[in-house]
């Protein structure tokens, strides 16, 4: 072998860090590949928080984040910074994950410089390019550019084939978030790490956080800003007042469009606990201990079934139909009444709860990163 093939892994958000951590680990174990992590800075604070927990460091920080940035401004800054990096670094291949602005811009910048690019979590689709916004368009555009499509499921593979993507460029791998979850559960079996998590969450929530039943909530999607978030917050308030024995724990995203309605409508309710965004370690512990989850997060839809936790998806559509079909998740929308009614049903009706909690996770077996790296090796003719 003349030299190692260099793989630049682009990521900028907390979910990207979580889902790419197993891939970075697998790349570093491959004898023919050299891995560099390039951070774009989209979610700078939350990104670096979880990167440290997941055991990797950022080799290059492009530092694109600015307060109150527009999508157009972010796109322009990303293109300038990513292209500048590529000009001097010339990787043999680049990897992106998911559907962020980083994904689309990095794919386009690599295309301009004729650098192959692999897309982890390729093929997720909803019927409209406006939902989720702007993520649906980001991933559709990226799929026209990339060289290797790492589809998490057969459904994602089928979506790519319908769009004319060549079958020999698609690898069905499972979702890397399941790899990340299994890795973290293994770490939390270590007494010192478990004690650290318990202490951290006791400080954030209270000494009874693990013994008092609770519902876990996440919500941050741009498509819900405005009336959608108002409805979600009103639903949470209604549920908290109906179930005083439960705590409703909400790690609140830093985006002001989330912070404002959440603090206005939910602050001060005795059994609603608003806490800062948590690192991945703490969040896995919360998922593992909760009764059920209300979320608009894609990653949570994929992780929670492995923990036996029902998920109510507070969106009008989802690019993850496998969970809905398997019965691990239920699409309820962002309307207050639907969120309240479906949560009541799960909390009050044991058969309905058990049916979702016992459904099988359709998103993978924890070996997705291994399959991705093996395919990259074959791309370069490596064993």
Where are these regions (language model features)?
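Nucleotide-activated sugar donor-binding and catalytic core shared by glycosyltransferases
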Residues: 1-250, 255-383
């Amino acid at each position: 072998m003349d030299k190692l093939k260099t793989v630049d892994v682009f990521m900028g958000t907390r979910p990207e860090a979580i889902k790419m951590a197993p891939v970075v680990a697998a790349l570093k174990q491959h004898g023919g590949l050299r891995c560099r992590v390039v951070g774009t800075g989209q979610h700078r604070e939350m990104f670096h928080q979880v990167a440290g927990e997941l055991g990797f460091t950022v080799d290059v920080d492009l530092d694109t984040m600015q307060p109150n940035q527009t999508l157009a401004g972010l796109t322009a800054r990303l293109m300038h910074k990513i292209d500048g990096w590529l000009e001097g670094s010339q990787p043999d291949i680049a990897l992106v994950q998911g559907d962020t602005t980083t994904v689309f811009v990095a794919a386009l910048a690599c295309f301009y410089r004729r650098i192959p690019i692999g897309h982890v979590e390729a093929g997720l689709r909803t019927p409209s390019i406006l939902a989720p916004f702007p993520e649906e368009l980001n991933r559709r555009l990226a799929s026209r550019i990339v060289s290797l499509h790492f589809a998490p499921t057969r459904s994602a593979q089928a979506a790519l084939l319908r769009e004319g993507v060549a079958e020999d460029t698609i690898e069905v791998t499972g979702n890397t978030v399941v790899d990340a979850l299994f890795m973290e559960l293994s770490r939390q079996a270590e007494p010192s790490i478990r004690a650290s998590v318990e202490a951290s969450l006791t400080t954030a929530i209270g000494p009874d956080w693990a013994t008092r039943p609770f519902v876990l909530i996440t919500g941050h999607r741009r498509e819900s800003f405005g009336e959608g978030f108002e409805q979600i917050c009103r639903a949470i308030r209604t549920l908290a007042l109906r179930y005083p024995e439960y705590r409703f724990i909400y790690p609140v995203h830093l985006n002001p469009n989330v912070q404002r309605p959440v603090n206005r409508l939910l602050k001060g309710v005795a059994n609603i606990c608003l806490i800062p965004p948590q690192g991945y370690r703490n969040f896995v512990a919360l998922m593992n201990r909760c009764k059920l989850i209300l979320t608009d997060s894609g990653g949570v839809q994929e992780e929670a079934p492995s923990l036996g936790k029902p998920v109510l998806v507070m969106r009008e559509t989802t690019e993850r139909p496998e969970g809905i079909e398997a019965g691990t998740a239920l699409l309820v929308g962002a309307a207050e009444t639907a969120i309240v009614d479906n949560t009541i049903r799960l909390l009050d009706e044991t058969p309905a709860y058990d049916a979702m909690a016992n459904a099988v996770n359709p998103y993978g077996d924890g070996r997705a990163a291994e399959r991705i790296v093996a395919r990259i090796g074959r791309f370069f003719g490596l064993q």
